[in-house]
Amino acid sequence: MRTKTSVSQEDYLKAIWELLEEGQPPISARLAEELEVTPPAVTAALKRMRRDDLVSVARDGHIDLTRKGRAIAERMALRHQLAEMLLTDVIGLPWSKAHDEAERLEHAISPEVESLLLKRFADKKACPHGVPLRGGFAQLRKQGAVLLSDLRANERAEIICVYEKDAKFLEFLDGLHLHPGTQLSIARREYDETLTLRSSNRTMHLGKPATSRIWVHRLSA
């Protein structure tokens, strides 16, 4: 008999999957920060998920997903992205609000609704924030994506993905008309790593706290 995972377990599994995709070692302290829960709550949740064969925990505290746990996490990640597309493309919700709303909706999407949404958005390759469907940040790396903060003066690039978990950051980018698909050039790179950007006859200055949250593809000069 298949055991149904709880909303809490789905959140934990997706958070672990996202950390792994981003290249960050999943440990209890990082999970507590990511999910805004206490360390004892993480310890108790991991104990239950180990019992249910969803995760494994190494002696050094590194957390990994079992095959069963990864399948659930990837399904939740996909449903999250489908929920974001439904919210932005159909309902018209601003992209800055889509992530938080999708965090709640993803748990209510059934296999039937998932299938219908996949058909509805068959032409889409990524969520509104640019995260590839069925691949996440690992797929971004395979596509040759780099952080905007890595670029040098006189390089050109196209934004392909932005950090989606900070609504204020997304509102900030919106105000600068910086979205996936926007092309820009680096006019200057300062000693403190502030970049002077040019895009559509506009000049703007972005510090590393912003440029380290934007993934781009380099364009030929």
Place the predicted regions along the sequence by residue:
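Mid-protein regulatory/catalytic core that forms ligand/cofactor-binding pockets
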Residues: E106-S212
